[in-house]
Every structure is written in C-alpha cells, then in structure tokens.
C-alpha cells in the first residue's frame, strides 16, 4: 500500500532512475525490514450520521467547520466545500460520513534519528506508512465495515489513483486545509 512515488517526491527524486534514488530505496527497505517487528502503525475510524449546515458538517454531537475552496477555478464553477458532499440538515434526512486517524509508533522516528539522514529517512517513511495505513483502512471500510463496495478488487496502482468509490480527504490538504480541525476531531 506504500506509494513510493510520493516517498521519492519528498526527497525531490521524482522521475527518472538514478544511483542516489536506488541507494535511497535500499536504505528505506533495510530500515523497514529492521523495524518491522518493533514498530506498528495504528488506525481508528468512526462512521457517523451526518448533515451539513452551511460550510459545517454536524457529526451527531459535534459541529466541524470547513473552509470553502479559496482558489477560484472558473467563473461558472462555485468554490466547493467538504460540506457540499453531505446532505443539508434542512432536507430532514441524514447522510453518513467517516473519520479516520492513522499514525506510526513515535519510537520509529525517534529511535532512528542517530544522524540527520536516518532521521529524515525514518520521518519520510513514517509519513508513507501512515498514508498506506489510511489507504488499507479505507479499503476495508469500503469493502467490509461500511460495505458499499464489497466486490471491489483494485490494484495498488488503482488505489493510488483513487479509482475507488468515495473520497478520502485529509486534514492539511487542499480539500481540508485548516489544521485546527485535528483538535476538534480529537
């Protein structure tokens, strides 16, 4: 589930093969193999009844404000907001939305920070592992827990291209740029 393209992008090694890129991959694989039995990724998810109210989404007992897109695409298209994808409260019927959180054991980065390079390698791998954990969890939610795509059978490349039904927006990215949402969700 690891998207290696983004790993290399973090290291500004997108595109063509090079000795440095090959060496980085060897170091990453070695660190993963050495760490596999000592560290774990963790994930939690909740599926909630939800409705929208303006730019906010109300998850049962919690109101979360979302920002509308700040960059204007075209004059004919409105600036969208995450709340636009949830049924409005005034319709009188509920919709559903899920929240995910993923992380990697803190020791993974701390224990591998003996020098700058290893620390950066561990941090960039931890980011990719957390993202891969979210991808795996999202797949399980679609196929089993929520079950709206039980027969889905996507390749890793199709997963990375988001060829699945539904969306998996992430805090800090363009669809949800406000990092303070983390404190509300927590």
Each model region followed by its residue ranges:
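Active-site loops and adjacent core secondary-structure elements that bind or stabilize anionic groups
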Residues: 1-120, 124, 145, 154
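Compositionally biased, low-complexity/repeat regions
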Residues: 43-45, 49-54, 135, 139-186
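Carbohydrate-interacting regions of secretory-pathway proteins
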Residues: 129
């Amino acid at each position: 589930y690891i998207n290696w393209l983004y790993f290399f992008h973090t290291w500004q090694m997108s595109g063509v093969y090079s000795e440095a890129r090959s060496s980085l991959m060897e170091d990453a694989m070695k660190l993963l193999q050495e760490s596999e039995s000592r560290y774990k990724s963790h994930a939690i998810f909740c599926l909630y009844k939800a409705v929208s109210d303006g730019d906010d989404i109300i998850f049962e007992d919690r109101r979360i404000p979302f920002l509308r897109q700040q960059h204007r695409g075209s004059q004919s298209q409105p600036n969208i907001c995450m709340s636009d994808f949830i049924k409005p409260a005034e319709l009188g019927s509920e919709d559903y939305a899920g929240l995910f959180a993923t992380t990697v054991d803190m020791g993974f980065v701390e224990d591998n920070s003996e020098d700058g390079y290893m620390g950066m390698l561990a941090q960039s791998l931890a980011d990719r592992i957390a993202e891969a954990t979210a991808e795996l969890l999202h797949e399980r939610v679609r196929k089993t827990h929520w079950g709206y795509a039980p027969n889905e059978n996507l390749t890793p490349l199709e997963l990375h291209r988001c060829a699945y039904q539904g969306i998996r927006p992430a805090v800090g990215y363009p669809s949800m740029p406000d990092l303070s949402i983390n404190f509300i969700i927590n």
